[in-house]
């Protein structure tokens, strides 16, 4: 077939047959899983997986303890305690990462609003966040969006209610986790996440070239649709 000829379309069944014929070593898959558990700080799961798979992590799992404490604090909304622990572990981290520090302070403001502590929230925003808002347009926009929650009787149902969702705390924790790992010169992004990004990039390249292929539409379930 010459390069000018159009390649034959591959059906979903043919595509799945090709995938099923690709052999991946179980040990390689297990190492990907262990890497994810360690990077995300899931110590208990990593210990159990080590026993089940025989795969050794590339770090001492006890070194995850402090990150786990920080994660628990952030996910419980105990932001000031999390900041104190971060400062005790890495005194220069928040000084050199001002956006991370702002997002932690912003999250504390969100927690005050969640508790309906309006006066404390306004005072905290004025004393701790106003200066950063003046220096950064992005910070100012985020601060204004957060303070807008105070204008609603039921802020959870407002256009800005997503700030009060658990996913917001998770977002802040992910940022903290990556910053701590970077500061410690450790891998901050799981290899599995990098592979998924590579998959999305490859599919985007195929889409731009208008190639018909079996596209993965749901990464969490591995759902593959028929070629279009």
UniProtKB/Swiss-Prot annotation:
This is Glucose-induced degradation protein 8-A homolog. It comes from Danio rerio (Zebrafish). Belongs to the GID8 family. The keyword Cell division does not apply. It comes from the Eukaryota. Disruption phenotype: Morpholino knockdown produces morphants which exhibit loss or reduction of dorsal embryonic structures and Wnt signaling deficiency. Identified in the CTLH complex that contains at least MAEA, RMND5A (or alternatively its paralog RMND5B), GID8, WDR26, and RANBP9 and/or RANBP10. Interacts with CTNNB1. Residues 63-120 form the CTLH domain. The gene is gid8a. InterPro entries: CRA_dom, CTLH/CRA, CTLH_C, LisH, Ubq-SigPath_Reg. Keywords: Developmental protein, Wnt signaling pathway. GO terms for cellular component: cytoplasm; nucleus. Pfam families: CTLH, LisH. Core component of the CTLH E3 ubiquitin-protein ligase complex that selectively accepts ubiquitin from UBE2H and mediates ubiquitination and subsequent proteasomal degradation of target proteins. Acts as a positive regulator of Wnt signaling pathway by promoting beta-catenin (CTNNB1) nuclear accumulation. Required for normal Wnt signaling and normal dorsoventral patterning during embryogenesis. The keyword Iron does not apply. One of its GO terms (biological process) is proteasome-mediated ubiquitin-dependent protein catabolic process. Residues 25-57 form the LisH domain.
